[in-house]
Regions:
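Surface-exposed, low-hydrophobicity segments enriched in Gly/Pro/acidic/Ser residues
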Residues: 1-170
Length: 170
């Protein structure tokens, strides 16, 4: 994935050209400026972020929705705690579970696959965030990684296993 150190302004776009090898064959996406493109000809690139960012745009499905900046860097495991909460519509209280569907009363941190290990890194959830470098967190850059692609969308929808509830919570 690509992560920028500073956010783009709303009127700025991000596009790339790249080359990769698959099964011994080299492929190119877009054109490099060294390909002999001269002004005023257009340089063809792959758009990563346009000026409009909403679920209705074609780019929405290509965006990473599972990596979140925590607002700091050099995160230390012994000082870091994570809790995922949802504001209950009827009570107005923040809770760390959804009280309906196939995930009824399960901690959201567990539902999101962020609690699968105990303090000895054995397969036994303990109700605490699994601080696993390069899997659930990039501590040096302060990024939280959900190990599912769309944690609050398609993943939660699948876990709820009920279309009406999924429409309510996702």
């Amino acid at each position: 994935y690509i992560s920028l150190r500073t956010a783009l302004n709303s009127d700025e776009v991000l596009a790339v050209a790249y080359e990769y090898t698959y099964n011994g064959k080299t492929y190119q996406v877009g054109e490099f400026s060294t390909d002999g493109i001269n002004a005023p000809n257009a340089l063809i690139l792959k758009l990563l972020k346009g000026t409009a960012t909403s679920p209705q745009t074609a780019l929405w499905d290509l965006m990473m929705k599972n990596i979140y900046y925590l607002g700091g860097n050099q995160i230390q495991s012994e000082k870091f705690k994570l809790n995922i909460q949802y504001k209950n519509d009827s009570s107005g209280v923040y809770v760390n579970y959804i009280n309906e569907g196939a995930i009824k009363n399960q901690l959201l941190i567990r539902v999101m696959n962020l609690d699968r290990l105990d303090s000895r890194n054995e397969q036994s959830p303990d109700g605490k965030f699994d601080f696993v470098e390069n899997y659930t967190i990039y501590s040096s850059s302060g990024r939280l990684i959900f190990p599912v692609v769309e944690p609050f969308g398609s993943h939660l929808r699948k876990m709820l296993n009920n279309e009406a509830l999924a429409d309510k919570y996702c």
